[in-house]
């Protein structure tokens, strides 16, 4: 398939630049992967779509304030976007400035250039940066970092984004982009699901800035996915096995949860073992033709044209079903991308 097969026209006004006043106030487009049937509704309808015995799998990563501004010690403004925290004092980051810094370049970061760091090495398009102070990287980011809103939101971050560009169940710091399907859940709707007999499990995938990188090839088979770190614990494996045994569904909240679970499944297939814990980097690329091993239903936002995420949704729901759903979403003026509306999709099995 060609990348252009996943193109659709999206009016600029449908890109959500701010979240709804309430997390659960978004709309929900339901898609039946087998029949292709579409139903327009509200996100709160999800309470009727999940059943007792189902397992919802959330990504509990926490978005770090990964964007920093500053200058080279020799002069010249720059912007640093952390891609990954390497250890307590080092990060791997994208650096935007007029001239790329060379190893040994000293950087002064923060509004008042209060934190000094050294550009230690370059790894392809990324720069390894080490802070010189005894403070831990995460503490420095909390002090001077900005929330790394996606480029299409096209506005500076605001105080409200510290809360709203974060799930209510976040736990493990490390993401530089939110697992956005989870943004629709508040504590009240989670409590109602629990009361209904729905089970919860949590994986961790630290979403990288690579999630926003365009696919730069024509044939999707030539695309190489960026690497992200994922954790699927024994507790999650046990919950999945128990769910399948009782006839329940594994409902993935977000494409990052899908990629975590299916990475564990693919690793087990390669090893010739039962589904087992997974703690490793993953470059899994899911596109039409992929056979899902774990996930039965998916909660997800509306994704960018020609992105790997709309390819994943097409693999899950069927290509034609997905493109028709997106056409309806545009016609019915759903809000798109990170702060936008959501879909509830059941897997195409026939």
Curated annotation (Swiss-Prot):
<dbReference type="GO" id="GO:0002099">
    <property type="term" value="P:tRNA wobble guanine modification"/>
</dbReference>
<dbReference type="GO" id="GO:0008616">
    <property type="term" value="P:queuosine biosynthetic process"/>
</dbReference>
<keyword id="KW-0949">S-adenosyl-L-methionine</keyword>
<keyword id="KW-0963">Cytoplasm</keyword>
<comment type="subunit">
    <text>Monomer.</text>
</comment>
<dbReference type="InterPro" id="IPR042118">
    <property type="entry name" value="QueA_dom1"/>
</dbReference>
<dbReference type="Pfam" id="PF02547">
    <property type="entry name" value="Queuosine_synth"/>
</dbReference>
<comment type="similarity">
    <text>Belongs to the QueA family.</text>
</comment>
<dbReference type="InterPro" id="IPR003699">
    <property type="entry name" value="QueA"/>
</dbReference>
<dbReference type="GO" id="GO:0051075">
    <property type="term" value="F:S-adenosylmethionine:tRNA ribosyltransferase-isomerase activity"/>
</dbReference>
<keyword id="KW-0671">Queuosine biosynthesis</keyword>
<keyword id="KW-0808">Transferase</keyword>
<dbReference type="GO" id="GO:0005737">
    <property type="term" value="C:cytoplasm"/>
</dbReference>
<dbReference type="InterPro" id="IPR036100">
    <property type="entry name" value="QueA_sf"/>
</dbReference>
<comment type="function">
    <text>Transfers and isomerizes the ribose moiety from AdoMet to the 7-aminomethyl group of 7-deazaguanine (preQ1-tRNA) to give epoxyqueuosine (oQ-tRNA).</text>
</comment>
<protein>
    <recommendedName>
        <fullName>S-adenosylmethionine:tRNA ribosyltransferase-isomerase</fullName>
        <ecNumber>2.4.99.17</ecNumber>
    </recommendedName>
</protein>
<comment type="pathway">
    <text>tRNA modification; tRNA-queuosine biosynthesis.</text>
</comment>
<dbReference type="InterPro" id="IPR042119">
    <property type="entry name" value="QueA_dom2"/>
</dbReference>
């Amino acid at each position: 398939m060609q990348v252009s097969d996943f193109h659709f026209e999206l009016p600029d006004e449908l890109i959500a630049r701010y979240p709804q006043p309430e997390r659960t106030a978004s709309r929900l487009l339901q898609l039946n992967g087998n029949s292709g049937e579409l139903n327009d509704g509200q996100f709160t309808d999800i309470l009727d779509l999940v059943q007792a015995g189902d397992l919802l799998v959330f990504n509990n990563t926490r978005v770090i304030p990964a964007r920093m501004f500053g200058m080279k010690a020799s002069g010249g403004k720059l912007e640093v976007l952390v891609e990954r925290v390497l250890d307590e004092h080092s990060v791997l980051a994208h650096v935007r400035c007029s001239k790329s810094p060379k190893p040994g370049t000293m950087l002064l970061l923060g509004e008042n250039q209060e934190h000094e760091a050294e550009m230690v090495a370059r790894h392809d398009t990324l720069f390894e940066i080490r802070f010189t102070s005894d403070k831990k990287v995460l503490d420095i980011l909390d002090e001077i970092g900005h929330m790394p809103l996606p480029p299409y939101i096209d506005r500076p971050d605001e105080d409200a984004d510290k809360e709203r560009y974060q799930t209510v169940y976040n736990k493990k710091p490390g993401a530089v982009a939110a697992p956005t399907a989870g943004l629709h859940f508040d504590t009240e709707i989670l409590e109602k699901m629990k009361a209904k007999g729905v089970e919860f499990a949590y994986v961790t995938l630290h979403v990288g800035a690579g999630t926003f990188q365009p696919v730069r090839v024509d044939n999707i088979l030539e695309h190489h996915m960026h690497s992200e770190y994922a954790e699927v614990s024994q507790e999650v494996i046990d919950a999945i096995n128990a769910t399948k045994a009782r006839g329940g569904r594994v409902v993935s909240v977000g494409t990052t949860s899908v990629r975590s679970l299916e990475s564990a499944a693919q690793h087990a297939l390669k090893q010739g073992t039962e589904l087992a814990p997974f703690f490793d980097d993953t470059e899994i690329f899911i596109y039409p033709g992929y056979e899902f091993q774990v996930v039965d239903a998916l909660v997800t936002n509306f994704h960018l044209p020609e992105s790997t995420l709309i390819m994943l949704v097409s693999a899950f729901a069927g290509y034609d079903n997905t493109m028709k759903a997106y056409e309806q979403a545009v016609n019915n003026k759903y809000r798109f991308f990170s702060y936008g509306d959501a879909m509830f999709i059941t897997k195409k099995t026939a």
